[in-house]
Amino acid sequence: MLADFCIRLALGLLGCLLLLSPIQSARPAPGTRPLVGANFFRTMFLVALGFCVGALLWLWPEVPTPLMVCLVIASILTLAGSVTWSLERSPGGVSLIVASIGVLIAACYLRDETSLVGGLSAAALLGAAMGSMLLGHNYLITPTMSMTPLYRLLAALAIALVLRAAVDGFALLRWTSGHSMANLNGDLLLWLPVRWLVGIVAPALLCWMAWQTARIRATQSATGILYVVVVFCFLGELTAQLLHKYISHR
């Protein structure tokens, strides 16, 4: 379960980088500033590397060979990405983002090919939440940076919440249509509201608050709100994995 969480989070974080104009950030035109500094891309690669290695260690030594290959390759690519984005003009930086994303999507598929859409929607939500929070910290270092990157990731977070709610809602409807409501025992009735209230509703409200706060350029306050969003999304997705494991055996 935690391995899935790590893989999805690494995938989501790297996916966020595609929204931050990586080509322009790596090679800004003369006289212009990059939308986001290369150090942020380097940080995201390092965080993704940590989650890739964490997933590999969590599954070891029973990790299937194809999945192990994917995770090892993803770890190498993210390590290379962190080095590349510390160099001038970040040679190959964008290619490493795309390649890492492709390998991690393959890892998600190998983990559970029957729920790839659910895994990708979870990756989008986790990545947008944590990516927004980490980007908020960047404004403490570079307070004059454009607000466009934060707006983009907050918009991505809102879209990811809608997508995740739709995917989970559809899965829940499919399950309830094929099972008697009597199967909703005490444990399921306890965790289901937690998953939706903590993992979807609360982050949606907080996302709106962070957006309104960012509009007045109170980036420190927005970052604080996004901390809470990250915690709620983490709890919601871990609960969702528990529910998925529970109902898949019924």
Segments predicted by a language model, with ranges:
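Polytopic transmembrane helical bundles with strong interfacial aromatic enrichment
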Residues: 1-143, 149-170, 192-250
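Membrane-interface interhelical connector segments
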Residues: 138, 143-146, 176-186
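Conserved beta/loop motifs at nucleotide-recognition and modification sites
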Residues: 172-174
